[in-house]
């Protein structure tokens, strides 16, 4: 792969720095700044977005729906035939149901398990009920509107993936995907990687890994071929193997991924990363998007990156293999 990027089909924008949940596996909620990507700032980069042939923008977080003018941003992008997806906690879906249905292409909500487990992990009383009400409000407006779920596996929900899939189906969601919790990187607003005691609060013991493996095998047995669970058997096995690697029982193995060559992550303060987990390659506060993704630092990074042997890639829980 060349180190020079001529097209960037996927752009992940974090329009707002804060979040309205307090999840045990994430530190974004600790952010106190009001940083957000303004419409004026986005306007400055629209020409580069078009030149890079961006096809899909994903609004990630923090919680995108906390942005003061999110639907203006989405309108600017959709006017250029760019698909816009929101990753959301689900707490604000009901409030913005009409705007979502008319101005966002699809939504992916966080779903951590059945109601009591979801609320415990989110540390927001009634979070599941608000998610359920939001999904219903959107589907009342458009029964075919696509809302998928993503479940992050960790110590508080490792024993209930099968039940989580059933909950997602009962909610009327379109699909569900699973990933392992990241416990080693400085992503998700960690000022430094977690110490061992903090990792142990989220990662699994060996007995828990075996329980998780059986659960994921049940998910594959019950839902294989349905199209409802995004991961196949191999990808589900990678989740339990990720926790085995954390225990030192197997070698951590990087997934197939081309994220640094086909995507970029722009944080609310303008910081640009090649993916969620690798260090920044520049900032939109001082350069244009095109200057950053094809700047010296970015090209040096991509030119030297061997995904298969890179230790950060080996720990990755959220890869992208764009075709």
Which stretches of residues belong to each language-model region?
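Radical SAM enzyme [4Fe-4S]-AdoMet core and its adjacent flexible, acidic
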Residues: 14, 32, 37, 80, ...
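Flexible loop residues that form catalytic
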Residues: 62, 90, 112, 181, ...
